[in-house]
Amino acid sequence: GAAMVGKRPIAEIQFADFILPATNQIISEAAKMRYRSNNDWQCPLTIRAPFGGGVHGGLYHSQSIESIFASSPGLTIVIPSTPYDAKGLLLSSIESNDPVLYFEHKKSLSFLKGRSARRILHCTFRKSRC
């Protein structure tokens, strides 16, 4: 809704494992908005979702579900691997005119260390480094 009227909403799913009930809306609605409207509409939506195992999350908190979305036309998937990439990819995700799934590995939220850029940094999608 908000993305359709000029806003750039950022949604956060507590765990990526819980995104599955929203799969139809993400793939069939948001990702195809530009195509369905013949380029008249865009859907600048960023969805953040921590994913992955190795953090003692158990059965429902350890899945890596990014492959479910990876082949969806109109949807961009980003997974940062460094603090530097995390900042740049998040800013680029927010500025994108198409929906972006911003997956963060749960381990990276606590254990990843490194420097991020002090300046405003933008990453180009489809490149490995900012």
Name the predicted role of every residue range.
Residues 1-130:
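Conserved thiamine diphosphate
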